[in-house]
Amino acid sequence: ITWDEEFSHRYDEWSASMTVDIDFYVDLARNANGPIVELAVGNGRVAVPVARATGRPVIGIDTSAAMLDQARTNARTANVQLELREGDMRDLAVSEPAALIYCPFRALLHLPTWADRRRTFERVAASLQPGGRFAWNAFAFDHTVAPSLDGTHQDEPVPHTNRYFVGDNRIDITLDTGAKSSIWWATKNEWLGLLDVAELEVLYGGFAREPFTDDSREYVFVARHS
């Protein structure tokens, strides 16, 4: 079984602990005067509440057909409109410049290289209207703890094992079923560098809009297109 197939059926369990982000992205969407786009929309965990709160459709993009099927079902159940598209965020293109593009639940970490992320950020910038916003979150990982965590098995939220590869900034996540995925962490300066090349301006960070500190465990960025 592939990661996409397995994960689409376990996503609600996997994401159960992440709820604080929904109100954050909903609030941004309410203040967006124009199209709203979610990258890595998954099963609509965030897009459905955003569409419900704003009364407007959300354009949702994901590479996983299995996750998009779940999103369609969840949108029908909630009686909201999602415009779902199977595609890669690195190739983002919209017919009308967006007022808000957001990428929740650390999904940008699935992009393995600087070039992949730079391309995505440039496509986001090209897809935003002047003054449009780009928001996303990613964990702030302390790589010095990686050796002590390598190979650890966790039962929650879904039974899995983590392997850490510091030289590659990579974490391999393998479910007990054998399905595997990888994420690549980035530092604060790497994120800020991506904003610079895409000519996006950081407004603030944190789900409570607090500033970044050395103790932050989650990066939450909101940037504005100049």
Locations of the language-model features?
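C-terminal lobe and adjacent flexible extensions of AdoMet/dcAdoMet transferase-like proteins
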Residues: 188-226
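Class I SAM-dependent methyltransferase SAM/SAH-binding core
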Residues: 47-91
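SAM-dependent methyltransferase
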Residues: 135-193
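Conserved class I S-adenosyl-L-methionine
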Residues: 1-34
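A short glycine-rich, Lys/Arg-flanked "PGG" loop and its adjoining helix->strand segment in the class I
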Residues: 118-130
